[in-house]
């Protein structure tokens, strides 16, 4: 993780030099580092999981032991390797390596082989190692296992990829999927909480508790809680295989160490020696253990093993002591290897719990970023992989038992190889997880949710694409909560989470985005040398008494390990020394280490101590260390106790220790693209962050190589004349999202009310905001096969009049051909019968065939059976299409106004857009007014203005700066001009504000949403029109529409809409008994004609003269029949 220099290359301001760059069109030597950093958290976490983490996970999987024919069989995974994606040897191909573009084009999965070495033993005697294929696992694009790793842009283009391909996603069935980063509690840190619902866990339980999420090196996690009970004792609870267990704390402490009761008592009361209540509580906890007859560590282990072994699923030959040790290893403080370290940590948690219950310290806010970290994609991948490997071992026993029931099976190398091949593969579980985002797990992996873990990395535009890699979600469980506390923006989030980049709907505050400078720690570092370094700085080891009383010392925790105690007067010096080592890269201190010293305040505040963190998945960000003059990565917890200045004049000597790298470091990547965002109302910046991701832009450059279901393309994009410096930092001109437009703020017609806007028809005819939609369809003839047949190929039957001059000889349309409704789309032949089949184009929208790809099978031996046809649908802006500026000012195109009727300036210039001035007062988007002046001056002087937020202030006014530039060009200081009416030619009385604004065309188009129906398909049961645009269904008519018609008194129109045009039917009814079901058509005598002289009779009354016809909705007849099935009779009165 490189700290120095990454943000030093930030452009001082935007420029137009790229327009005259002589190397345009030539791929650069290296990829843009800023873009690659956006997905670094995803890629690096997967690299660790697939390489180092996999070996740690294999070591953490305990041997699977079971009895078979009076023998003890042991299976152990000793090694596992994931191979880069490739096709099997013997495949017909030029290169065995598989590349992502091939998987996208064939709707297949980008995956590699997982091979493991399985060691087996009988009765404890090793018998050998078998190399076994466990299945395919998905590979993250641009990771070290990907075949694109470290390739330069030129080679990436040769493999049909983007020159700036960032990776960070998986390809599942041809679709790019991203594992979401989720907010989880900070690992290996005791969090004091107050939860009233804990009182319902048992008699005497209180709302006080201390929780810790213990995480191992291979990311396996177990949540562990200490509960305070009313009688002063403590209960320890943990979860094993989704089941909650409770254990008195005294049993856990005595099981971990062979200390005497007095030693345990002395350790627990450290710092509280004078607290008689606490001393009595500790004595009571130890007395509970003695009352169960457990006086020694071995007796306690035997007792715990006897109680828990039924839930641990261990072999019968395991003694109780080993079962208890298995429990301690898998459920209690699992991040620690030493039982002594676990003992000291539980003692610290107990002291913190009593301090919370006695009101001596505050509770920690679990919704604060201080007590949180992120769940990285590699972490989920590794946890899921480890569990599935454990399940594979269990499946081998099941297969072995089934085989033994049918035949006499002996355990040898050959038989085990056959049985191993019958175990459950890991291929389908992984593809299901990434394809659906649903987690199928017996343990739950310690998550609060089992759905929504993955999302599609759709390339609607480049902003939306890259935001997938910077978003963090609070969790699906919190979306259903009625409370708003989890959604609040807390001050602790400053610099880590963007305050404006969050949706304005249901996910508001739950779906957040990291700031541009925020990073996620992805590396593990071994900290074996740090405890000795701390002791050298004055920290007293945990098993040694300090010089001062414990109440005058801080506990020192390093990644959840109780290292020792430090004098409270010496602690600031120790923290500063560690910080200096971190910044200067000395003493092997990692640069992402977090040094948080929580001081004693004499008041109930956060629990004091010196907490050191080097673990991954934490959020860190760079700031300038004023004392050392270098950049430093700081974490969320240590930022609470720092004085970080923003501007130079806020730095006070002896108080300010750090300074922000730049004022806009609190904004996300997308929010940094908003020009003059500091001049806008905050909600407008939120809206732009969302609308910027809905813009019809230029998401990629390899349209000809993509097979996405739908892609958008703006045909006439432009580089904005007014843009922040971050726009150039990320080279966003390669993926533009809008057009510079001449905008006049004038209420010129009646068609611009309620945010509607007028567009110059001449500009529209010249291609203003013209776009296209690319749609791809896969046709696989193998899906059309009948049972046992393989005889269909694409082609045209010679002389077929249906496809003359429409399809090529291969049965496919010509490239560039225009398709209309009913035109031949493609044709295929049955080689056995010679019969030809023609499929016709069924879409109502005309299109152009853009490209056709021919696909094969995995072995390269497939016939001409699978193709992908991509069509291009031109989309000119039409009335009703949505547009927006970069300041959250959205509106629809209401009218294309003829150029001869548009107002014009003295120079004859006509605006492209007429914007209603009533859109400014309530929205307060002053940034749009400034952009209009800046864009106008930029066009006049041939410049590109810097719109980075916070560069202007009250002393350095933006109005003064851009007004003077307009004045220098001969225009009005305030950006207004005299306009002339296009209708009368008369000069307008008011000065009109006119300038250049960058406008975006959004993807919400009338062509995708309009719906018209006269007659069409109906539902078979209710006889009502079907819903849905794709099936030409009826238009939805809801309660609000009904109420509107009732309010206007148009009841007959309501009758026509909801009855005549819906499911009107004529039914026979008995007037006497009021039944719709009793009238039945009588059966005629054999001599009668079947169609003549037949009449309805009431089966209840036995009469036919009481039968009449009524018009009722068909769904009512269905409803009456359903009620009759429940013995409920419906009687109608006829008036």
From Swiss-Prot:
Cofactor requirement: Mg(2+)
Binding site for RNA: 180, 367, 890
InterPro entries found in the cross-reference section: DNA-dir_RNA_pol_su2, DNA-dir_RNAP_su2_dom, DNA-dir_RNAP_su2_hyb_sf, RNA_pol_bsu_CS, RNA_pol_bsu_protrusion, RNA_pol_Rpb2_2, RNA_pol_Rpb2_2_sf, RNA_pol_Rpb2_3
Region feature (Fork loop 1): 439-453
Source taxon at top rank: Eukaryota
Positions annotated to bind DNA nontemplate strand: 1020
Keywords: Chromosome, DNA-directed RNA polymerase, Magnesium, Metal-binding, Nucleotidyltransferase, Nucleus, Phosphoprotein, Transcription, Transferase, Zinc, Zinc-finger
Renumbered residue ranges of the record's region Disordered: 1-26
Region (Loop A), start-end ranges: 236-247
GO aspect biological process, one term: rRNA transcription
Cofactor binding note: Two Mg(2+) ions are coordinated by both the catalytic residues and the nucleic acid substrate to enhance substrate recognition and catalytic efficiency.
Region span, Loop B: 194-208
Enzyme class: transferase
Residues annotated as transmembrane: none
Cellular compartments per GO CC: chromosome; cytosol; fibrillar center; mitochondrion; nucleolus; nucleoplasm; nucleus; RNA polymerase I complex
Residues annotated as binding Zn(2+): 1070, 1073, 1098, 1101
ZnF (C4-type) residues: 1070-1101
Residues the entry annotates as binding Mg(2+): 755
Phosphoserine: residues bearing it: 1051
Entry EC no(s): 2.7.7.6
GO MF annotations, alphabetized: DNA binding; DNA-directed RNA polymerase activity; DNA/RNA hybrid binding; ribonucleoside binding; zinc ion binding
Annotated positions binding DNA template strand: 1036
Family, similarity comment: Belongs to the RNA polymerase beta chain family.
Function statement: Catalytic core component of RNA polymerase I (Pol I), a DNA-dependent RNA polymerase which synthesizes ribosomal RNA precursors using the four ribonucleoside triphosphates as substrates. Transcribes 47S pre-rRNAs from multicopy rRNA gene clusters, giving rise to 5.8S, 18S and 28S ribosomal RNAs. Pol I-mediated transcription cycle proceeds through transcription initiation, transcription elongation and transcription termination stages.
Domain notes: The active site comprises the fork loops, the loops and the rudder that stabilize the transcription bubble and assist polymerase translocation.
Name used for this protein in its record: DNA-directed RNA polymerase I subunit RPA2
Species this chain originates from: Mus musculus
Protein's gene: Polr1b
């Amino acid at each position: 993780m490189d700290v120095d220099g990454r943000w030093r290359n930030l452009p001082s301001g935007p420029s137009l030099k790229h327009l005259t760059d002589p190397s345009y069109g030539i791929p650069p030597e290296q990829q843009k580092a800023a873009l690659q950093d956006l997905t670094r958290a995803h890629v690096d976490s997967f690299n660790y999981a697939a390489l180092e983490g996999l070996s740690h996970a294999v070591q953490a999987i305990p041997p699977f032991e079971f009895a078979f024919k009076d023998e003890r069989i042991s299976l152990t995974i000793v090694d596992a390797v994931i191979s880069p994606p490739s096709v099997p040897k013997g495949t017909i191909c030029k290169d065995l390596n598989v590349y992502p573009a091939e998987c996208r084009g064939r709707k297949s999965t980008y995956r590699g082989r997982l091979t493991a070495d399985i060691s087996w033993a009988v009765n404890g005697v090793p018998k050998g190692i078998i190399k076994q294929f466990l299945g395919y696992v998905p590979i993250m694009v641009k990771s070290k296992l990907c075949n694109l790793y470290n390739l330069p842009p030129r080679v990436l283009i040769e493999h049909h990829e983007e020159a700036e391909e960032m990776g960070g996603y998986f390809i599942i069935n041809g679709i790019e999927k991203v594992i979401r980063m989720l907010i989880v509690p900070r690992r290996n840190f005791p969090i004091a909480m107050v939860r009233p619902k804990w009182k319902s866990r048992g008699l005497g339980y209180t709302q006080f508790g201390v929780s810790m999420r213990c995480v191992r090196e291979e990311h396996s996690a177990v949540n562990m809680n200490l509960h305070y009970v009313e009688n002063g004792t403590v209960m320890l609870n943990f979860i094993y295989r989704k089941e909650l267990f409770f254990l008195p704390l005294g049993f856990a402490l005595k099981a971990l160490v062979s200390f005497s009761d007095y030693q345990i008592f002395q350790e627990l009361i450290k710092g509280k020696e004078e607290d008689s209540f606490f001393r009595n509580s500790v004595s009571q906890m130890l007395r509970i253990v003695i009352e169960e007859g457990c006086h020694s560590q071995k007796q306690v282990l035997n007792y715990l093993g006897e109680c828990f072994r039924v839930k641990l699923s261990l072999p019968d030959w395991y003694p109780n002591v080993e079962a208890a040790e298995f429990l301690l290893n898998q459920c209690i403080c699992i991040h620690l290897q030493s039982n002594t370290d676990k003992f000291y940590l539980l003692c610290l948690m107990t002291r913190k719990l009593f301090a919370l219950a006695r009101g001596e310290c505050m509770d920690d806010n679990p919704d604060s970023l201080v007590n949180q970290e992120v769940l990285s994609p590699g972490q989920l991948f590794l946890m899921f992989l480890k569990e599935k490997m454990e399940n594979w071992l269990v499946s081998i026993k099941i297969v072995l038992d089934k085989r033994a029931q049918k035949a006499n099976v002996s355990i040898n190398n050959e038989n085990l190889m056959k049985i191993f091949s019958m175990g459950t593969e890991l291929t389908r579980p992984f593809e299901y997880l990434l394809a659906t985002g649903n987690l199928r797990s017996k343990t739950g992996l310690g998550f609060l949710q089992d759905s929504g873990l993955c999302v599609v990395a759709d390339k609607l535009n480049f902003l939306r694409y890259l935001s997938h890699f910077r978003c963090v979600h609070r969790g699906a469980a919190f979306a259903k909560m009625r409370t708003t506390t989890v959604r609040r923006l807390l001050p602790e989030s400053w610099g880590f989470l963007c305050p404006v980049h969050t949706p304005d709907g249901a996910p508001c505050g739950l779906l957040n985005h990291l700031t541009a400078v925020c990073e996620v720690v992805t590396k593990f570092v071994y900290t074996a040398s740090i405890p000795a370094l701390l002791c050298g700085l004055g920290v007293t080891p945990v098993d040694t008494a300090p010089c001062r009383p414990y109440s005058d010392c801080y506990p020192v925790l390093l990644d959840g390990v109780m290292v020792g105690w430090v004098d409270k007067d010496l602690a600031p010096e120790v923290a500063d020394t560690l910080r200096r080592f971190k910044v200067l890269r000395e003493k092997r201190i990692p640069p992402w280490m977090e040094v948080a010293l929580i001081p004693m305040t004499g008041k109930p505040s956060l629990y004091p101590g010196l907490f050191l963190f080097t673990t991954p998945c934490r959020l860190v960000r760079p700031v300038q260390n004023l004392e050392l003059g270098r950049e430093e990565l700081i974490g969320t917890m240590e930022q609470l106790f720092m004085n970080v200045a923003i501007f130079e004049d806020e730095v006070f000597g002896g108080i300010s220790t750090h300074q922000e790298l730049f004022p806009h470091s609190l904004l996300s990547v997308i929010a940094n693209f908003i020009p003059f965002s500091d001049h806008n109302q905050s909600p407008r910046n939120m809206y732009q962050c969302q609308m910027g991701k809905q813009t019809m832009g230029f998401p990629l450059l390899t349209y000809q190589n993509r097979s996405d279901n739908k892609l958008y393309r703006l045909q006439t994009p432009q580089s904005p004349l007014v843009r922040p410096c971050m726009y150039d930092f990320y080279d966003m001109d390669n993926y533009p999202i809008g057009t510079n437009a001449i905008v006049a703020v004038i209420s010129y017609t009646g068609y611009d009310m309620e945010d509607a806007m007028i567009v110059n028809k001449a500009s529209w005819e010249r291609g203003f905001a013209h776009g296209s939609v690319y749609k791809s369809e896969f046709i696989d003839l193998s899906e059309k096969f009948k049972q046992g047949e393989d005889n269909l190929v694409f082609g045209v039957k010679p002389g077929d009049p249906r496809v003359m001059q429409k399809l090529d000889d291969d049965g496919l349309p010509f490239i560039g051909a225009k398709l209309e409704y009913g035109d031949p789309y493609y044709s295929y032949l049955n080689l056995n019968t010679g019969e030809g089949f023609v499929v016709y184009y069924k879409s109502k929208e005309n299109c152009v065939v853009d490209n056709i790809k021919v696909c094969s099978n995995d072995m390269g031996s497939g016939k001409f059976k699978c193709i992908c046809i991509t069509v291009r649908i031109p989309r000119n802006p039409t009335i009703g299409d949505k547009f927006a500026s970069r300041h959250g000012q959205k509106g629809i195109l209401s009218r294309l106004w003829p150029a001869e009727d548009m107002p014009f300036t003295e120079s004859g210039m006509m605006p492209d857009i007429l914007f209603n001035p009533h859109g400014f007062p309530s929205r307060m988007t002053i940034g749009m007014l400034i952009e209009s002046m800046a864009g106008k001056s930029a066009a006049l002087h041939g410049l590109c203005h810097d719109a980075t937020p916070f560069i202007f202030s009250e002393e350095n006014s933006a109005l003064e700066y851009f007004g003077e530039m307009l004045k220098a060009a001969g225009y009005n200081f305030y950006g207004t001009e005299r306009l002339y009416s296009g209708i009368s030619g008369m000069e307008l009385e008011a000065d009109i504000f006119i300038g250049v604004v960058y406008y975006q065309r959004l993807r919400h188009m009338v062509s995708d949403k309009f719906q018209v129906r006269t007659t069409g398909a109906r539902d078979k049961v209710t006889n009502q029109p079907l819903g849905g645009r794709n099936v030409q269904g009826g238009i939805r008519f809801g309660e609000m529409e009904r109420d509107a018609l009732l309010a206007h008194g148009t009841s007959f129109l309501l009758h026509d809409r909801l009855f005549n045009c819906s499911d009107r039917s004529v039914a026979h009814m008995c007037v006497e008994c009021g039944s719709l079901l009793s009238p039945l058509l009588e059966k005629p005598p054999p001599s009668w004609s079947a169609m003549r002289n037949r009449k309805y009779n009431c089966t209840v009354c036995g009469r036919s003269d009481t039968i009449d016809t009524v018009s009722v909705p068909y769904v009512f007849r269905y409803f009456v029949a359903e009620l009759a099935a429940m013995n409920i009779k419906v009687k109608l009165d006829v008036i």
